[in-house]
Amino acid sequence: MKEILTVTELNSYIANLLDSDPFLGQLWLRGEISGFRLYQQSGHMYFTLKDEDSTISAVMFKSRARGLKFKPKDGMEVLLRASVSVFARQGKYQLYVEEMQPYGIGGLFLYLEELKKKLAAKGYFAPERKKAIPAFVQRVGIVTSQDGAALRDICRILKQRHPGVEVVLAHSSVQGSEAPGELAEGLRLLNSYAEVELIIIGRGGGSYEDLMAFNSELVVQAIYESNIPVISAVGHEVDFTLADLVADLRAATPSQAASLAVADMQALSRQLDNYQQRLLRAMQRKLLYYTEIIDRLMMKRIWKQPRSLLHMREELLSQLEKSLSRGMAEIFREKKMKLSMNMAALDSLSPLKIMERGYVLLQKEGRIIRDEQQVQIGDRLEVAMRHADLEIEVIKKERVKRWKS
């Protein structure tokens, strides 16, 4: 004879089946609210979610409901994240809602306006809290999809403007339910790298709904808490996201973000050449000016007068020569100082400068070695020196302490 179950046992069995199903444990649903009830004493919300053909009961407990940014009501279309389980006492399966927001352009707009007001009141968008973008960046962190056009555009412009810049990528989805958490985690990850000097976060444009991940409070919070300056590059020239408002600098496109991130080294070189030419022309003008003065003096009658008059003019000429010499020396010293400062700034950016002091660049399969954990015994490494490249094999590995912490 087959086992006979009680009603409670059957309901519990069905509940266990639903609770163990990974698909039913994390669902995103869209539907219309009907029969909405808020119990003031408990704070729990009960309603029916429906579409044109079906309905399902739903509950949102107080611990989740108090985090809502809007007031649910009948007839409102919503997007929610929930799990499916059975209320065993009644044998009724229903949704247990974890997160809910208005759906559709109108609903999203109202939701974002309320969130924007809340964040503005906390000072998230205040201009005085925004960090300055560094002038000479050597290492840029990027939070975006590794497969997107945005990453290719950013890297292309970075290499055009500054061939020596290094890129650190934190891969993330840029749309969908997982995107907000991944974007926020990418920002936190890049903040853990002390070498990263600037972060670009963004995507290659899209519809208003596609950009919703960059309106997430999770992402806004992560940008606000970043210790590293952040440039937003959502790729939409008209619509501003909340990420744009909280970022230290907003770029209309990923390409523009890359242009804002690093200095144009070719332009700097041209500027130095221009300074040199201006200095030379200024000196030539001064020399011509005083030469003409001397020539005019030489043409005057004084040179035909007795020796006493000639002596007086000789003294004047001597004074003029001294003035000319001092003036030109001062101009030359000032221009030379400016030129030296600009040349030093440019020269300090060159990796070859470090190699001149006897240092080398150690690489493994094209990647720079920064930590002994990247190297194993038997690895073949490439050594870049000032005037030669070597290939070596690791035969011994020993951790040593070079200086006191």
Curated annotation (Swiss-Prot):
Entry's Gene Ontology cellular component terms: cytoplasm; exodeoxyribonuclease VII complex
Primary location recorded for the protein, binned into one broad class: cytoplasm
Disulfide bonds: none
Subcellular location: Cytoplasm
Catalytic activity: Exonucleolytic cleavage in either 5'- to 3'- or 3'- to 5'-direction to yield nucleoside 5'-phosphates
E.C. numbers: 3.1.11.6
Gene Ontology biological-process entries: DNA catabolic process
Protein keywords: Cytoplasm, Exonuclease, Hydrolase, Nuclease
Pfam families reported for this sequence: Exonuc_VII_L, tRNA_anti_2
UniProt-recorded Gene Ontology molecular function terms: exodeoxyribonuclease VII activity; nucleic acid binding
Cross-referenced PANTHER family: EXODEOXYRIBONUCLEASE 7 LARGE SUBUNIT (PTHR30008:SF0)
Name recorded for this polypeptide: Exodeoxyribonuclease 7 large subunit
UniProt organism field: Syntrophomonas wolfei subsp. wolfei (strain DSM 2245B / Goettingen)
Source organism phylogeny: Bacteria, Bacillati, Bacillota, Clostridia, Eubacteriales
